[in-house]
């Protein structure tokens, strides 16, 4: 009987993961590559329980989606944001592994190189 209960628990867990993934899929941007989306979806799913909208609304989910875009735009496109905001999203993304990130040169770095 224990084996049957374990199998049922595993099936329930897998079903929950599928539902969460299906839910997150609606937020994928048309222009996101598979690599960008997988990273951003992990960010969203990791924090979804903390950002669920209360029954009366509140926009918590919108806030999470915005934070996920800030993080992805910074990582993949080199966008810069307010230091406090970047610190927050980088802390939220701690532990999310993304391979082969593009390398960006900032304007300041270019100016220093040019002046040398």
Curated annotation (Swiss-Prot):
Residues 24-116 form the XRN2-binding (XTBD) domain. Belongs to the CARF family. The modification N-acetylmethionine is found at residue 1. This is CDKN2AIP N-terminal-like protein. It comes from the Eukaryota. InterPro entries: XTBD. Interacts with XRN2; the interaction is direct. Keywords: Acetylation. It comes from Bos taurus (Bovine). The keyword Transferase does not apply. PROSITE patterns: XTBD (PS51827).
